[in-house]
Amino acid sequence: TVLIEKLRELRVDIDFQYVQRHFLGYSFKSVREKVFDNFHVNLPKSFEAEYRTVLLEQFRCELQPTDGVQALLSGLQLQFCLATSSSPERTAEALRISGLEDFFTAKIFTAEDVSQGKPAPDLFLYAATKMGVAPSECLVIEDSHAGVTAAISAGMQVAHYTGGRHLAGTVSKVIDAFPHVPVIPHWKDLVELLPAAE
């Protein structure tokens, strides 16, 4: 809703469903380009910083870890990392607020690490290289159409996580586009998909 409100100040009138379908999983750079391409509005230089300030304030009031993720990460017996379209600052704050930062020390890769973000495979390939793992041996857990596309393009296995509150209105789009991709409504479902997660 923060992005919707900030864009409305510039007379870009979109709703929650539009954001979910067109911006979820994309870097801010990509969002900026999409706004220009679709609405012919060039976001001012100050827009990103102002948006992130308000967003982080909202995070501090509302952000919570999804049910079961801490238990899963605590018991995971294999290498894992975080590869996200968010900025380093937003990622660090989100992990701190949700109590997950200790799980990802030195294992965080963001959109700023690559020239092309999702749906290009660059971020996932970069993360795999840094982790010393072949793409074919990686399992990506993604919640967005752009992310699932990127994982498939990277030659990685992928599962579609649908348990986040922010995903309303987007699940069917991903399932329809990728009917062969396993769906994970809850983190406990990952254990059934990946025995090594126990």
Model-inferred region functions:
Residues 1-5, 30, 34, 50, ...:
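Alpha-helical elements of Rossmann-like donor-binding domains used by nucleotide-donor carbohydrate transfer enzymes
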Residues 1-21, 38, 153-154:
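Active-site neighborhood of HAD-like aspartate-dependent phosphohydrolases
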Residues 6-7, 27-41, 94, 128:
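Helix-loop "lid/cap" segments that line or gate small-molecule binding pockets
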Residues 12-21, 40-50, 102-105, 135:
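Short, surface-exposed acidic
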Residues 13, 33-71:
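Metal-dependent phosphoesterase signature
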Residues 23-27, 51, 64-68, 86, ...:
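Short beta->alpha linker loops
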Residues 57-82, 88-92:
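Short, acidic loop-to-helix structural element flanking the phosphoryl-transfer center
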Residues 74, 78, 87-198:
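Asp-based, Mg2+/Mn2+-dependent phosphohydrolase catalytic module
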